[in-house]
Amino acid sequence: MARQRAAFGSVPRMNPLPKFQLKLWGTRGGLPVSGPQFQKFGGNTICMEMRCGEHVIMFDAGSGALSAGHALAAEGCKELTLYFTHSHYDHIGGLPFFKPLYCGQSSLKLWSGHMGSAMTTRQMLSEFMRKPFFPIGPDYCSAGIDARDFTAGDVLTPYPGVTIRTGMLNHPGNAVGYRVEFGGRSIAIITDTEHEPGTLDPAVLRLIDKVDLFVYDATFLDEEMATFKGFGHSTWQQAVRLAQAAGAKQVGFIHHSFNRTDAELTKIERAAKRQFPGAFCGRDFQVIEV
């Protein structure tokens, strides 16, 4: 059958790109905070939800996982994949309260790649959810849980058309950075990494090369780095330098210090935008589409 021609003067309908977005459920590092001085940017620890078309991919499960889990359960989400950057408390503390774990019809794949041969993802989950630290273990969860492991540097394909590139970051106990490619676009997750002043980490540059969006560990300020050397974190100024060097389109600052107030983060965001217009401070519940 011949393709119908568009009417004279009309514009042929283009197929829209599939949805590719990142939702920030938690943007703090260290521990959750609350109070009037934290209302604009929020106080939940790291948890992110990515939509690649119909597929749901989570990154980390800090305290933001509580709200994320309730929203996904209400939506009727039955299948998702969760990748851990690492297993410090502010990145896994919300996992036992993640509602899809307790939905019998749900299927979850949990992945980690920062521990090498020291511990598997399954062992990490079992060690975290056990007495005397927690009243129940993973066996109480009624969802189907498939715990898997990878090695930093591996390229993963969790769903058709979705490619995830991984790389090791500079953090005590290790952490993994991710670059997700879907529909000709890319988003990178770079949290919990310490830079050496005056240098740009080649592993980070590879993950963020010409990326549409990356979120980055901005716990400290450049002038604070000497005081906190060895803590495993970076700065918003380094994020801007990386974005400029890599040809990135947008960079979002995450892993805000639990001491950083709304007024301070607003000041940081304004200063960053003067240097790189695509920079912003991430906020709890913010959605960014690429």
Named regions from a protein language model:
Residues 59, 85, 190-191, 216-218, ...:
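Active-site flanking residues adjacent to catalytic metal/cofactor-binding acidic residues
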Residues 113, 192, 256-257:
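Short strand-loop junctions, especially beta-strand C-caps/beta-turns
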Residues 186, 196-284:
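Cap/insert and terminal regions of metallo-dependent hydrolase folds
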